Amino acid sequence: MENMKQVVVATKNMGKVREFAELFERFDLEVKSLHDFPHIEEVEETGETFEENAILKADSLSRQLNAIVIADDSGLIVDALNGKPGVYSARFAGEPKDDQANIDKVLQELNEVAFEKRKARFYCALAVAFPEGDKKPVIVNGTCEGFILEQRRGENGFGYDPIFYVEEYKKAMAELSSDEKNAISHRGRALRKLEEKIPEWFLGE
């Protein structure tokens, strides 16, 4: 039963790992990441939706590691850019992944677009896959509404956080504390939905 108290987060992004660890710290649950399994290669994200990518990663890695795996696929959806960068958020400016280059590209494409027309949302799809073949993956999602700023603000977070304005706090996402961000973030909301859906033995309750 000991391995039931462990979950692998399917990412090497330490910003995401910290968010998962903070959100799960009240449970008797050990959070590991792909950094703990250096021999495992990240799964190529070939899905056309956030949900498809999350399930693809969780299912593949769960079978490889024989472990419970949480995978998320998340990104930024900007209305004025017809939904871009969307599922390509991490590589919007091309390879290799570069947060600053991605931000620069979004700001460039929104140049001269008025603030009230820069509505956007963060979207997160979370999938949990189990090594037992008879258990279907659990899938949930969460969103966070906001606007795209004209320039970076704040030092916290990662990804597009410095240009994402949260009206509730009147701050950029990167200006929020971890607790503030977890309360309203797309990933935080998805994880709270996940808590209601995953089996009791997974949470160790």
From Swiss-Prot:
Catalytic function, reaction form: XTP + H2O = XMP + diphosphate + H(+); dITP + H2O = dIMP + diphosphate + H(+); ITP + H2O = IMP + diphosphate + H(+)
Record-level Gene Ontology MF annotations: dITP diphosphatase activity; ITP diphosphatase activity; metal ion binding; nucleotide binding; ribonucleoside triphosphate phosphatase activity; XTP diphosphatase activity
EC numbers on record: 3.6.1.66
Record flagged with keyword Acetylation: no
Coiled coil regions, renumbered to chain: none
Gene Ontology terms: biological process: nucleotide metabolic process; purine nucleoside triphosphate catabolic process
Domain of life: Bacteria
Any Pfam family the entry gives: Ham1p_like
Active site (record annotation): 73 (proton acceptor)
Transmembrane intervals: none
Keywords: Hydrolase, Magnesium, Metal-binding, Nucleotide metabolism, Nucleotide-binding
Requisite cofactors: Mg(2+)
Cofactor binding, note field: Binds 1 Mg(2+) ion per subunit.
One annotated Gene Ontology cellular component of this protein: cytosol
Residues that bind substrate: 11-16, 74, 158-161, 181, 186-187
Positions that bind Mg(2+): 44, 73
Family classification: Belongs to the HAM1 NTPase family.
Oligomer and partners: Homodimer.
PANTHER family xref list: INOSINE TRIPHOSPHATE PYROPHOSPHATASE, INOSINE TRIPHOSPHATE PYROPHOSPHATASE/HAM1 PROTEIN
Function: Pyrophosphatase that catalyzes the hydrolysis of nucleoside triphosphates to their monophosphate derivatives, with a high preference for the non-canonical purine nucleotides XTP (xanthosine triphosphate), dITP (deoxyinosine triphosphate) and ITP. Seems to function as a house-cleaning enzyme that removes non-canonical purine nucleotides from the nucleotide pool, thus preventing their incorporation into DNA/RNA and avoiding chromosomal lesions.
Protein name per UniProt: dITP/XTP pyrophosphatase
